Amino acid sequence: MKVSIVVLNFNGINLLKKFIPQLIKNSNGYDIYVVDNNSSDNSISFLKTEFPEVKIIRNKENYGYAGGYNSGLKQIDSDLFICLNNDATFLDNKSIENIVKVFEKNSSIIAAQPRIINYSNKDFYDYAGASGGFIDLFGFPFCRGRILNHIENSTSYQTTREVFWASGACLAIRKKSFESVNGFDSSFFAHMEEIDLCWRLKNKDINNKIVVIGNSSVYHLGGGTLNDNSSFKYYLNFRNSIIMLVKNLPKRMLFISLFGRFLTDLLILVFSILTLRFNVFFGLLRAYSYLTINVFKLKRVKSNNEYYKFYYCKSIFYNYFFRSKKIFSKI
């Protein structure tokens, strides 16, 4: 199996200095590519000088996460892509090898992620993926090891199991599977694109398996490109999650899911005012403004009516705030 490790970068020279040496050390000789979204901070010249073994693909502009990977992966001849954030690093070389072994042993597994641990506090999982992703009735993602903002200890959930989505912080995916659904939705730019991709793969064939690999770990710093408190980040999250629902849900579930989502977002809007979180407030308003203007442009994909086999048919918000269920094993 031909494997390529692919790192997307935009003005991340300081992150490359920190994480590329560790990646090379743990790469087991697999090809490493950096797909650069037209950086202006000398990222390219730095890589060429310091790490000539790293292969560089340069995009003409900043296409975001979705478009950047779509453009870059088209140019790479490989059977398996391991897409890694520029602010992440593998625990050791066994972590990469254990990912490859899973794909070699089971052809029905088309995408996967390692356990994603917080780089700054390794006792806890990272927000972006933890030990595998799921989604609730209203399109809110949560993780095995992270529900909303409650993050669990990283010593938990160390088994390999099937999940709904694999995190974009470290997403391993077969090239033929990626191409079978035309890759990421470039209109997302960033955020939720990996969940949408996994959902479309499930809609294409419910037998497609997406897993978290329990004996593989990545440390993720987070906020490498978009600041965690960015209003633009909240805008993308709210907008893209609703677009994802419209695209992928079975018709019979559309109304109840979108109505419940609207009510939940209304509560979030009120809460953001009361707590003076204006980044959330303006991000949410901007998302609904976009959706109102572009409502007739949203396109659906063929949905799989067996979605209930891999979809959490309840509200994670309700369980979290009204039933105090903040631990994955309790839901």
Indicate where each model-derived feature is located.
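A conserved acidic beta->alpha catalytic loop
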Residues: I13, Q22, D36-S45, E61, ...
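Short, acidic, metal-binding catalytic loop of nucleotide-sugar glycosyltransferases
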Residues: P21-Y30
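Glycine-rich, basic loop-to-helix element that forms the pyrophosphate-binding segment
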Residues: N59-I76, N86, D92, N98
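Short aromatic/hydrophobic "clamp" motif used to bind/position activated sugar donors
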Residues: F81
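Conserved donor NDP-sugar-binding/catalytic core segment of glycosyltransferases
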Residues: T89-G129, G133-F140
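A recurrent flexible, glycine/aromatic-enriched loop bordering the glycosyltransferase active site
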Residues: L137-C143, L148-I173, I195-L197, L226-D228, ...
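A short, conserved alpha-helix in the catalytic core of glycosyltransferases
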Residues: Q158-S217
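Active-site-adjacent helix/loop segment of glycosyltransferases
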Residues: N203-R300, N305-S315
